[in-house]
A protein has these predicted regions:
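Intrinsically disordered, polar/acidic, low-complexity terminal segments
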Residues: 7-53, 64-117, 126, 130-167, ...
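Membrane-interface micro-motifs in multi-pass membrane enzymes
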Residues: 29-46, 91, 119, 162-206, ...
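Transmembrane alpha-helices and membrane-interface helical segments
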Residues: 50, 153-157, 199-207, 233-244, ...
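Transmembrane alpha-helix segments characteristic
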Residues: 66-75, 167-173, 259-263, 340-368
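Juxtamembrane "helix-exit" motif on the non-cytosolic side of transmembrane helices
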Residues: 82, 129, 175-184, 267-276, ...
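Short hydrophobic alpha-helices at membrane interfaces in multi-pass membrane enzymes
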Residues: 200-223, 250-256
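Membrane-interface alpha helices of multi-pass inner-membrane proteins
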Residues: 212-240
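Perimembrane helix-loop-helix junctions
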Residues: 232-263
């Protein structure tokens, strides 16, 4: 059996042949740990209830979507409680650095971008956590799951899906377990918050109500000041707001706010804080646009949510995404032949999520055109947005109702559910592995004396940065010292 699994591993990712044996033994150990964990029976019971609910779901059931969302919310919370993580990982340390070492003022820190991202509003959340909750990183885990639950509520409330089986597909997509890599790393809450922005925007942008206009205006303005994914909203407005049937003054307002948000996100740090080391990018995006890797990534990342986190299946993702894109193009072309330009107008107006998903894929393919982008869990949010839009479009195309085959849709639902929860480095496997690493570091510090502090720091540094050396070890040690002295965050003991 081990040889069979090893051969599969090598076939799927030949570049990591040396790691396959280690991965297989590690996965077996983690599986045994999961089965023997405290809340495993409760988790298994909830999962079984969800599976039974899907198997015996009828086409027309009242409140089935809300019930499914509630069960998934409980399942995700149980997984988080059973496999707790409360330590900063990788980018988190850079994002919280100034809260400990205080090299610059708080205002400068808020305006200082991280890599290519302006994360002003995410840093405000970090600051609140630091000042009122002792920098408790576990809060981010549960906040992410709450946001996902709220997204599902917003979706169910606004989309009147009369087919319960099809409605379940959208709920399962929203609750994809591939997002656990985002849930359990504090900085990745930016992806979930932007997901919340995008779904809220989708159901307010076409409204002329004052409350909707205010909310939509806020979302458009703050989204590029939150994270890179947030740029999809102002870019959508600047490109496609014409097609929305709202007052032209509202359209102009949205366009002004889009430009203002982008300019503030890009220019404010450079204008007022040019000493922060922010430099312009030397990337030649035109060359990338004409390179095959752009198109591999563009189509591949659209299907990210379906894929295991293995580079060897990235090309499969590209094929899936390309087929979906072709199907959309075919339906648009058919509607154009029947309705001329009006058919395209209707498509753009009614399929905001597809457009937003394509904008996401375009941005990611320009900035990170590689196979890892296609399969990496962090990009699953953009894929989920596109897939929700894609399946909504198929559902609403009346002449293609034959595509809503009950058994086929149930198979898709079960695949997304099980792959998201049980594939390696997804769902339960991801969270359990993080939990074990988390506890290994914590136990070292709990048993720590002044004579072994350096040993624990080295262990933590190698573990929390996956063996990478990009973050200065001296800054890491200084942060640990401050956290220990103040009994703060995960060193609060």
């Amino acid at each position: 059996m081990d040889t069979f699994l090893l051969n599969i591993c090598v076939f799927l990712d030949p570049t990591r042949k040396d790691k396959c044996r280690e991965f297989i033994f590690e996965t077996i150990d983690i599986t045994q740990f999961i089965v023997n964990s405290n809340l495993f029976l409760f988790i298994a019971l909830i999962f079984l209830l969800i599976l039974i609910k899907i198997f015996f779901l009828k086409e027309y059931e009242n409140y089935s979507s809300l019930l499914l969302a509630f069960f998934l919310f409980i399942l995700f919370v149980l997984i988080m409680v059973n496999f707790r993580t409360n330590i900063p990982w990788v980018d988190d340390w850079e994002w919280i650095e100034n809260l400990q070492v205080q090299k610059i003022s708080t205002v400068e820190w808020l305006l200082q971008p991280a890599n290519i991202h302006n994360i002003f509003f995410i840093k405000i959340i970090f600051l609140i956590n630091n000042n009122f909750f002792n920098l408790n990183f576990e809060l981010f885990n549960y906040l992410s799951i709450i946001l996902i639950f709220l997204i599902s509520i917003i979706f169910v409330k606004n989309e009147k899906i009369d087919n319960s089986i099809y409605a379940a597909l959208f709920i399962i997509l929203i609750f994809s377990g591939k997002q656990f890599a985002n849930f359990s790393q504090a900085s990745n809450i930016a992806w979930t918050i932007c997901f919340f922005y995008i779904i809220s925007f989708k159901y307010t942008v076409s409204s002329n109500k004052v409350s909707s206009i205010i909310l939509c205006s806020i979302l458009i303005f703050i989204s590029p000041l939150t994270f890179g994914l947030g740029y999809v909203l102002p870019l959508y407005v600047l490109t496609f707001i014409y097609f929305q049937e709202i007052n032209y003054k509202i359209k102009i307002n949205y366009m002004i706010l889009s430009i203002a948000g982008i300019l503030l996100a890009q220019m404010l740090p450079r204008i007022f804080f040019d000493d922060l080391g922010i430099s312009g990018s030397n990337t030649n995006y035109l060359n990338i646009l004409f390179h095959y890797s752009f198109y591999l990534t563009f189509f591949g990342v659209l299907s990210n949510v379906f894929l295991p986190w293995i580079e060897g299946v990235a090309y499969v993702g590209t094929i899936i995404g390309f087929i979906q894109f072709l199907l959309i193009f075919y339906l648009i072309l058919k509607n154009y032949n029947q309705q001329s330009f009006f058919g395209i107008h209707i498509f753009i107006k009614n399929n905001t999520l597809i457009i937003l998903g394509l904008i996401f894929a375009f941005i990611v393919s320009l900035t990170r055109p590689d196979l890892q982008t296609i399969v990496a869990a962090r990009y699953s949010v953009g894929s989920i947005i596109f897939q929700i839009g894609f399946w909504l479009y198929l559902y609403k195309e009346n002449q293609y109702r034959y595509l809503i085959n009950v058994n086929f849709i149930k198979l898709v639902i079960i695949y997304i559910l099980t792959s998201g929860l049980f594939f390696p480095y997804h769902g339960i496997h991801w969270q359990a592995k993080r939990h074990l690493s988390n506890n290994k570091v914590l136990e070292c510090y709990k048993n720590d004396t002044k004579t072994v502090t350096n040993r624990c720091n080295k262990l933590a540094y190698n573990t929390l940065f996956y063996g990478g050396k990009w973050y200065e070890i001296e800054l890491f040690n200084e942060q640990i010292r401050v956290l220990k002295d103040k009994n703060k965050s995960f060193l609060n003991f």
